[in-house]
Amino acid sequence: METLTAISRWLAKQHVVTWCVQQEGELWCANAFYLFDVQKVAFYILTEEKTRHAQMRGPQAAVAGTVNGQPKTVALIRGVQFKGEIRRLEGEESDLARKAYNRRFPVARMLSAPVWEIRPDEIKFTDNTLGFGKKMIWLRGSGTEQA
């Protein structure tokens, strides 16, 4: 199975991303509901400007994070680790992402928080259901996939 396809299928079944930013050596992580766009290979989240993590990252910053389930046995562990960039969307780009986000999470229509895009450069998918420690790696722009 193609790596990005496997990753995207699994991410479509999840809904919370943990992402971390740093500023001047200080790290901070946050959780958010996400929409994953398989075409752009990007997560879309809503978060207020006044939050600690938004203040630390500014309009654009390096980011790392995870998405994981909560299995009760090691044999069922599946999860994603990623690194990339986060940026606040503006204008039409923000409007389009918000419409898609609201379709997945209708309650978000009541929120005015800005839309942010997490654009991973690298994604590592661990899937123990395919064998203990099975990992698949996707790298943006490399044209290569590692399994």
Swiss-Prot record:
Q: Which family does it belong to?
A: Belongs to the UPF0306 family.
SUPFAM superfamilies attached here?
FMN-binding split barrel
Q: Which organism is it from?
A: Escherichia coli O157:H7 (strain EC4115 / EHEC)
Protein name (Swiss-Prot/TrEMBL): UPF0306 protein YhbP
